[in-house]
Regions:
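Active-site-adjacent pocket scaffolds in enzyme catalytic domains
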Residues: 7, 19, 78-80, 89-90, ...
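C-terminal domain-boundary segment and adjacent tail
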Residues: 179-205, 253-257, 262-336
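Secondary-structure boundary elements
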Residues: 53-54, 133-155, 177-186, 297
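Short, flexible helix-coil linker/hinge segments at the edges of structured domains or between repeats
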Residues: 23, 107-133
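A short, flexible beta-alpha/helix-coil linker loop
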Residues: 15-16, 67-68, 108, 274-277
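A cross-domain feature marking catalytic cores of carbohydrate-active enzymes
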Residues: 10-12, 60-64, 103-107, 158-161, ...
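Acidic-and-aromatic substrate-binding clefts and catalytic sites of carbohydrate-active enzymes
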Residues: 35-42, 64-86, 113, 132-137, ...
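Active-site beta->alpha N-cap acidic-glycine motif
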Residues: 1-97, 142-146, 152-159, 269
């Protein structure tokens, strides 16, 4: 029996900088602690230990100009460049190729004037909502150029918040051109849509075809249940198990992974770097490992960890099986 792909989507990573702390509505966790503004590299190393041990694959963002604090090539405000380089080297050598690397546009904060590098008044997603391909193409191009200079091989992009949703046709046309101009790739993917509980299950779909180029939409199908670790100091085993239960219960019979699997969905499991880092405690990384253990125990004969690049290749190789855009395009209530 052909196994179902399972992929871990990790939004918002950047060298040390917490882009979430920069754009959060409040500078405090729900239990009143200050949100930390940087995540030490040790948390990345712990994450790598887990994904290597359990064979986890998926998508991992690298925000090129995180929180409008500079860029990952020329330096980030208040961050030691040696630590930035250490972070980038770790991602290049330990996160890839299991995870497909993507920009999450330029800053995941304020839109950027690409001529000056300075922040514009509007948040990136708000700015993008009124743009077309003539302005989106150079914007996406700049994000790809920075990651290419950082020696990342990129085949797709991630939308910060719902970047491009209101002008999706223009957005994906811009992405296709930018990807071809920077990397020479005719096929690429993007992550924008969050869909869950859709009858028949959700799979990637062909979103754009023109000039022998193709763009694939890869949706997410779960909430980010690791998020609650940001707002708690609990690190005990009972709490870890509770968080993991949302994805897959200890007996392998419940949780959103099981629910979506029974529907027939590709299992694209959503989380954020800040959720795994848990305001510095790394509780989310421990919960992720518990989820991975349960997947191994109960689903190893039904699912296989898959990178987004592999999902792209599968979709392109059998386009006719992936042309149907889901009828239900409901947006789930998820925190970014």
């Amino acid at each position: 029996m052909k196994k179902i792909p399972i992929s871990l989507i990790i939004d918002d990573p950047a060298p040390l900088v917490s882009v979430y702390a920069a754009h959060a509505d409040t500078p405090f966790t729900k239990d009143g602690r200050p949100l930390i503004e940087t995540f030490p590299n040790d948390l990345l190393f712990r994450f790598c230990d887990v994904i290597e041990k359990h064979g986890i694959k998926g998508k991992f963002s690298v925000v090129p100009m995180p929180a409008n604090k500079g860029d990952i090539i020329n330096g980030l405000e208040g961050i030691d460049q040696q630590q930035v380089d250490e972070w980038l080297d770790c991602v290049r050598t330990r996160v890839t190729p299991a995870f497909s690397i993507c920009p999450e546009m330029l800053s995941h904060n304020k839109a950027v004037d690409i001529e000056t590098g300075k922040a514009l008044p509007l948040r990136e997603d708000v700015w993008a909502s009124t743009q077309d391909r003539t302005t989106l193409t150079p914007y996406i191009t700049r994000a790809l150029e920075i990651l290419k200079e950082a020696k990342f091989d990129v085949h797709g992009v991630i939308s910060p918040w719902y970047f491009g949703k209101e002008v999706e046709e223009e957005y994906i046309a811009a992405l296709s051109k930018a990807m071809y101009d920077v990397y020479g790739y005719k096929n690429c993917f993007y992550f924008l849509h969050q869909l869950r509980g859709v009858p028949g299950g959700v799979k990637p779909w062909i979103a754009y075809e023109e000039d022998d180029r193709c763009v694939v939409s890869i949706p997410g199908v779960t909430r980010d249940w690791f998020w609650e670790t940001i707002d708690s100091t609990r690190t005990d085993d009972e709490f870890i198990s509770h968080v993991a239960d949302h994805y897959i219960t200890a007996d392998g019979k419940g949780g959103c992974i099981i629910h979506e699997l029974e529907l027939g969905a590709n299992l694209t499991v959503c989380t954020h770097w800040q959720s795994l880092c848990s305001n510095g405690l790394g509780t989310g990384i421990r919960a992720l490992e518990e989820v991975a253990k349960r997947v191994e125990k109960h689903l190893s004969d039904r699912v296989e960890w898959t990178s987004f690049n592999e999902l792209l290749e599968t979709t392109i190789n059998d386009k006719n099986a992936y042309r149907a855009r889901p009828v239900s395009m409901q947006k789930i209530d998820i925190e970014f």
